[in-house]
């Protein structure tokens, strides 16, 4: 059966494996968007290395977990945010993070997938994808 939201499945897989104290997580199916989100999480220090495996179907990703994820998940529906929206962090974003200094909101911008802090730094808005803390 095809997956309705592969990004939501990937984030749920990461969270479930983290709560089970596993050292690795196997994400399937793989996509460019999931790989971009994993790069942002890796850059922020939430996950370790990850490897894409082409199995001739949709692909798989093996992620090394560091034990730093307390909660992660998708933001659905994907809210559009302009630069001013990122500055004042609207109420529907505030409900996903425990504090303004803890965690990141992952956004998709015309310059690629990045955290909300990078979006503020580059003065660019985008569409919310998920959250991690």
Curated annotation (Swiss-Prot):
Coiled coil: none annotated. GO terms for molecular function: rRNA binding; structural constituent of ribosome. GO terms for biological process: translation. One of its GO terms (cellular component) is ribosome. Gene3D superfamilies: 3.30.1370.30, 3.30.1490.10. The keyword Ribonucleoprotein applies. Keywords: Ribonucleoprotein, Ribosomal protein, RNA-binding, rRNA-binding. One of the primary rRNA binding proteins, it binds directly to 16S rRNA central domain where it helps coordinate assembly of the platform of the 30S subunit. Part of the 30S ribosomal subunit. NCBIfam families: PRK04034.1. This is Small ribosomal subunit protein uS8.
């Amino acid at each position: 059966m095809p997956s309705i939201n592969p990004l939501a499945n990937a984030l749920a897989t990461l969270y479930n494996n983290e709560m089970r104290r596993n050292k690795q997580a196997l994400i399937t199916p793989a996509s460019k968007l999931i790989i971009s989100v994993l790069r942002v999480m890796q850059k922020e220090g939430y996950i370790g290395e990850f490897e894409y495996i082409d199995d001739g179907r949709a692909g798989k990703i093996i992620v090394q977990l560091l034990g730093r994820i307390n909660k992660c998940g998708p933001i659905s529906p994907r809210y559009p945010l302009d630069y001013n929206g990122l500055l004042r962090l609207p109420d529907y974003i505030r409900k996903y993070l425990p504090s303004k200094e803890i965690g990141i909101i992952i956004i998709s911008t015309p310059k690629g997938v990045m955290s909300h802090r990078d979006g503020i730094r580059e003065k660019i808005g985008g569409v919310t994808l998920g959250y991690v803390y």
